[in-house]
Amino acid sequence: MNPNQKIITIGSVSLTIATVCFLMQIAILVTTVTLHFKQHECDSPASNQVMPCEPIIIERNITEIVYLNNTTIEKEICPKVVEYRNWSKPQCQITGFAPFSKDNSIRLSAGGDIWVTREPYVSCDPVKCYQFALGQGTTLDNKHSNDTVHDRIPHRTLLMNELGVPFHLGTRQVCIAWSSSSCHDGKAWLHVCITGDDKNATASFIYDGRLVDSIGSWSQNILRTQESECVCINGTCTVVMTDGSASGRADTRILFIEEGKIVHISPLAGSAQHVEECSCYPRYPGVRCICRDNWKGSNRPVVDINMEDYSIDSSYVCSGLVGDTPRNDDRSSNSNCRNPNNERGTQGVKGWAFDNGNDLWMGRTISKDLRSGYETFKVIGGWSTPNSKSQINRQVIVDSDNRSGYSGIFSVEGKSCINRCFYVELIRGRKQETRVWWTSNSIVVFCGTSGTYGTGSWPDGANINFMPI
């Protein structure tokens, strides 16, 4: 090859390499521009598809940086659309309950500014669990805490903190309320808050931090609600409310709410004679509630809510080991599934239970007469067999020498099933402990487990002699 041919060959190869490099740079530039300007194509609808007019809630918007040959490419990850909860997964199969949370509010009140509360409960959004309670408008070490044994005053407010965080001075006051219920529909919180005169109270419906609707007393006799979480399925939330006598016939209605707006009201139907303070849980496609009969029965009423056609049915828990306090001893207590047992039916306490096939998981005070101690167990046939009394898997939550109080259920959705959890109110102060002038509580929380577990007792634990008077 002569010198001229060598020069031509080298030039051709160099030109080819330069051309390839140039084309590669153009390709990289085109890719960068295309990725940057095609963000709108994330989850883009098919052609001619009608898009909804309402806004779509975006949970997060993350930019991922990819480095390629010293060239930065920004790739927009498609945002996640927040959806309504439907609770369609099966209920978790459990062997019992394991400790989950305890806030120690009364013990902490001995040396800190902690709210005076009662009627606590727990509810969860899709990410976190929160504890709620009705505050008395005062901290414990405060003269305003005197005589806080009373249920209904205009200063009571609904408090909300992350579960396990006591109600300190920085706690958010969600609304004015001496009776309440809260639940999260998957997009935002709904709070049902009742306050006002005993004979003409108002229930406010607050959704996503805004007052959306309200309803006044319909029987002019202490309008009241669950004191535990409501339940939302596919954007419709339901809450049980009662107005009328606490020891005679009352008017119970089941309200259906969508994004804070009342869309339907159904009267109570079925055989339940008196219904208060229901503990409700999702039982897809409906909702089931275990309530308090403060008139005729120490066996607990059951309210079944059809979320599709708004129909209601009611009955009583079949278990002959009844759940209310006061009650007969277990040898003489009864329940026939349909009617109140007329056994020490007046008075009572908020409680919970839930069905497990034909069986029943339930909790109750250990004392049959007082709000003392707390136990859980499973009743074989307790959901389907009248007067069933075969008990297994008993656990002591609070020993019988210590005070308890209200209790209620809340549900937590896992990857494959829905777990049932419960809380126990641990009341301290008046009326039983007369050294002090206040009445308040702490809580302990347990959740269902498929594992093994040990034993113990988890009372409030405050030494009343250390407490402010």
From Swiss-Prot:
Pfam family for this entry, one: Neur
Stated regulation of activity: Inhibited by the neuraminidase inhibitors zanamivir (Relenza) and oseltamivir (Tamiflu). These drugs interfere with the release of progeny virus from infected cells and are effective against all influenza strains. Resistance to neuraminidase inhibitors is quite rare.
Bias (Low complexity): 333-342
Post-translational modification note: N-glycosylated.
S-S pairs: 92-417, 124-129, 175-193, 183-230, 232-237, 278-291, 280-289, 318-337, 421-447
Subunit structure, as described in the record: Homotetramer.
Stated role: Catalyzes the removal of terminal sialic acid residues from viral and cellular glycoconjugates. Cleaves off the terminal sialic acids on the glycosylated HA during virus budding to facilitate virus release. Additionally helps virus spread through the circulation by further removing sialic acids from the cell surface. These cleavages prevent self-aggregation and ensure the efficient spread of the progeny virus from cell to cell. Otherwise, infection would be limited to one round of replication.
Protein name from the UniProt record: Neuraminidase
Species assigned in the record: Influenza A virus (strain A/Tokyo/3/1967 H2N2)
